[in-house]
From Swiss-Prot:
Cofactor: Fe cation
Gene from which this protein is expressed: AOMI 1
Family: Belongs to the alternative oxidase family.
Reactions performed catalytically: 2 a ubiquinol + O2 = 2 a ubiquinone + 2 H2O
Induction: Increases during ripening.
Name of the protein: Ubiquinol oxidase, mitochondrial
Binding site for Fe cation 1: 147, 186, 189, 288
Membrane-spanning segments: 143-163, 205-225
Length: 318
């Protein structure tokens, strides 16, 4: 009766009182009263479940991260820099970093002689006009838009060569990897520029529009004429070199402040810890010169009636 009164009173006496009352009973009485035992077990289960849920919630709030299942055995190994400090990036690993070849010739130019070359050259010059009008000398925003476009051709070319390799059951000569490396490198340029520029909402909207139009246009172009597509990209890279050279002139003149380099750029290009914006733009420009050479070379190979797999791919630069 003491136990029943405790339950009816809504636990007014608390669990301690109830358990004390039960402990005073004769063992035979406890064994014979299955209802009381069931009620107590039920209350204990509710209490334990609530505590476990609270603990999990607490852990989630402390970590401020989604709970990840260990069932699949996927985990990030501990990765460190050369100095032993923890590697902070998930988007690229230490073995994917490199030092740009700053000795590359920035003045190389493919002189347009054939109709295809002239068409590619004029197309790029026409595309530059609205860019000059919209961005003028805001080279940070200009570079962001440029890298949004420049990261597309490598991905499109690599994807189509990948499908061709599967379809024809033949090797690509390393060109799939080379073009995808180019696309990833251009994407890292963009990620760096976003750290520097912090684009406004209308610039982000412009990026969406440009990417949608350019990706589909370049996809169709590459299907119809890969050699023309690579020639256009070669001339686009020449324009990129010019834009970054003007960017550096404004930094040298003081028109643009030579701020410290973003951490992501220091790690990706293996720059010194005291690197500045000028150092970042210098290595990015060197990358663009390399992409210029690769795409003009790819176009030359196909102009000669050969396939890309017949020529060695420049794999491993980045």
């Amino acid at each position: 009766m003491t136990v029943m009164r405790g339950l009816l009173n809504g636990g007014r006496y608390g669990n301690r009182y109830i358990w004390t009352a039960i402990s005073l009973r004769h063992p035979e009485v406890m064994e014979g009263n299955g209802l009381e035992s069931a009620v107590m077990q039920w209350r204990r289960m509710l209490s334990n479940a609530g505590g476990a849920e609270a603990q999990v919630k607490e852990q989630k709030e402390e970590k401020k991260d989604a709970m990840v299942s260990n069932y699949w055995g996927i985990s990030r190994p501990k990765i460190t820099r050369e100095d032993g400090s923890e590697w902070p990036w998930n988007c690229f690993m230490p073995w994917e970093t490199y030092r740009s070849d700053l000795s590359i010739d920035l003045k190389k130019h493919h002189v347009p002689r054939t109709f295809m070359d002239k068409f590619a050259y004029r197309t790029v010059k026409i595309l530059r006009v609205p860019t000059d009008i919209f961005f003028q000398r805001r080279y940070g925003c200009r570079a962001m838009m440029l890298e949004t476009v420049a990261a597309v051709p490598g991905m499109v070319g690599g994807m189509l060569l990948h499908l061709k390799s599967l379809r024809k059951l033949e090797q690509s000569g390393g060109w799939i990897k080379a073009l995808l490396e180019e696309a990833e490198n251009e994407r890292m340029h963009l990620m760096t520029m976003v750290e520097l520029v912090q684009p406004k909402w209308y610039e982000r909207l412009l990026v969406l529009a440009v990417q949608g139009v350019f990706f589909n246009s370049f996809f169709v172009l590459y299907v119809l004429s890969p050699k023309l597509a690579h020639r256009i990209v070669g001339y686009l890279e020449e324009e990129a070199i010019h834009s970054y050279t003007e960017y550096l002139k404004d930094i040298d003149s003081g028109a643009i402040k030579n701020i410290p380099a973003p951490a992501i750029a220091i790690d990706y290009w293996r720059l010194p810890k005291d690197a500045t914006l000028k150092d970042v733009i210098t290595v990015v420009r060197a990358d663009e010169a390399h992409h210029r050479d690769v795409n003009h070379f790819a176009s030359d190979v196909q102009v000669q009636g050969k396939e890309l797999r017949d020529a060695p791919a420049p794999v491993g630069y980045h």
